[in-house]
Amino acid sequence: MTEQLPQPNPQNILPPAKMAIPPSIGEVITSMATGNSYTMGEKIGEGNFGVVYSCKDIWENDLAAKVLKPIGTYENVKASATEELTKLVHLRNPHITFVYDAFEFRDTFYIITERCYCSVKQLFSIQNFNGLTWLMPIARSLLQAVHYLHINNYVHQDIHSANVFTALVKDEMMPQDNKIVQFKLGDLGVAKLFNELDAKNTRAQWMLPPEVLNPNEFGAIDRRIDIYHVGLLLLELAYSKELRFTPEEIISGKPREMAVQLQPPYHFALEKALRRHVSYRTADAMELWRDLHTPSQGTVVLLNAPK
């Protein structure tokens, strides 16, 4: 008599795990949400949570496709995509990278945004780079973006030179020749509401604000974490080079000390934005913009100012 093997219970059979499939160069992908089709190009960037590809839509717009990495389960990636899209749509602003579309294709999540020419980080590689030439134009756009985030109760938490971009806007009458330079704040993936702020949300270890390193000494985390980060970026532009600080240097106030050595009006504006104690730091983006237009306050005042 032939022994019968036990048959599996269909209810116990799990469906195959969904796998994200990256796009290939030249592939045309259509969004069911908008009907727009995107011809995929080369990989142009990569972050903690996504890979970015160049692409063009049917209107010949130069765009970027952020493809979310399959970190965690399909459900977790979908939740992350939905959260980021919600923020991008809610926080649409001329000084924040613009979102065009979002969709799922082959169990892979795409977020389509405008394509920027390069990050501010790449500007530092220009030969004989003079950051002071760029400081005020970048500050004007960046601070407007930060102001818009804050009045909508969001904090970016991760502002640095790789997350601020130069965008080239073409002249429709002379698209190959004339282009206007604009600056945009991007990567809102880790942005949080005011009541969701946590020390663990700040990603870049080299730019952790003092209040993250020692909240008992320097104060609680609030929206002024963005002011500190903007201050660090503008300090880099003022010195025309990338700067990195150890936690010990941040706690000792080295960024502020470097700001004090600058010429007016930068020394007053940036030393105030880079104060270690949150309660003495620049209150908001508008105040920092006004400080950048304030005449010299005097070296003695700066040296005696709260740190």
Model-found features: residue ranges?
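Conserved short submotifs of the Hanks-type protein kinase catalytic core
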Residues: 106-119
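Activation segment signature within eukaryotic-like protein kinase domains
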Residues: 138-139
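AlphaC helix of the eukaryotic protein kinase fold
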Residues: 78-90
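AlphaC helix of the protein kinase catalytic domain
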Residues: 120-130
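Conserved activation segment of eukaryotic-like protein kinases, specifically the C-terminal portion
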Residues: 199-212
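Protein kinase glycine-rich loop
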Residues: 41-47, 52
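Catalytic-loop of the protein kinase fold
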Residues: 150-167, 172
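Activation-segment/catalytic-loop signature of the eukaryotic protein kinase fold
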Residues: 102
